[in-house]
Amino acid sequence: MSVTKQDVEYIATLARLSFSEDEKEKMTKELNTILHYVEKLNELDTEEVEALNNMNERHNVLRPDEIVASIENSKAIKNAPDSVERFFKVPKVIG
């Protein structure tokens, strides 16, 4: 399986992203590199490997809450397909 430039354009449309032609080429190459790596992982024999519930023995390890800067509201609204004043406008879901 491989990713084409058209695949990248389609995914970008779904994610409401826009890329230059150079960025599309770069994304295509990078996604194909990732897929090639995943295909290599599929070649591994895992028949004798015991399934894990967690990657390590530690459970419920949480990071401390820290206040960090976020995207400005005006920049976030620019990414929305529709907005009203400073709010996202979304389709009605509940009748």
UniProtKB/Swiss-Prot annotation:
GO terms for biological process: glutaminyl-tRNAGln biosynthesis via transamidation; regulation of translational fidelity; translation. The keyword Ligase applies. It catalyses: L-glutamyl-tRNA(Gln) + L-glutamine + ATP + H2O = L-glutaminyl-tRNA(Gln) + L-glutamate + ADP + phosphate + H(+); L-aspartyl-tRNA(Asn) + L-glutamine + ATP + H2O = L-asparaginyl-tRNA(Asn) + L-glutamate + ADP + phosphate + 2 H(+). Its EC number is 6.3.5.-. The keyword Ribonucleoprotein does not apply. GO terms for molecular function: asparaginyl-tRNA synthase (glutamine-hydrolyzing) activity; ATP binding; glutaminyl-tRNA synthase (glutamine-hydrolyzing) activity. It is an enzyme of class 6 (ligase). HAMAP family: GatC. Heterotrimer of A, B and C subunits. PANTHER family: GLUTAMYL-TRNA(GLN) AMIDOTRANSFERASE SUBUNIT C, MITOCHONDRIAL (PTHR15004:SF0). Belongs to the GatC family. Allows the formation of correctly charged Asn-tRNA(Asn) or Gln-tRNA(Gln) through the transamidation of misacylated Asp-tRNA(Asn) or Glu-tRNA(Gln) in organisms which lack either or both of asparaginyl-tRNA or glutaminyl-tRNA synthetases. The reaction takes place in the presence of glutamine and ATP through an activated phospho-Asp-tRNA(Asn) or phospho-Glu-tRNA(Gln). This is Aspartyl/glutamyl-tRNA(Asn/Gln) amidotransferase subunit C. It comes from Chloroherpeton thalassium (strain ATCC 35110 / GB-78). The gene is gatC.
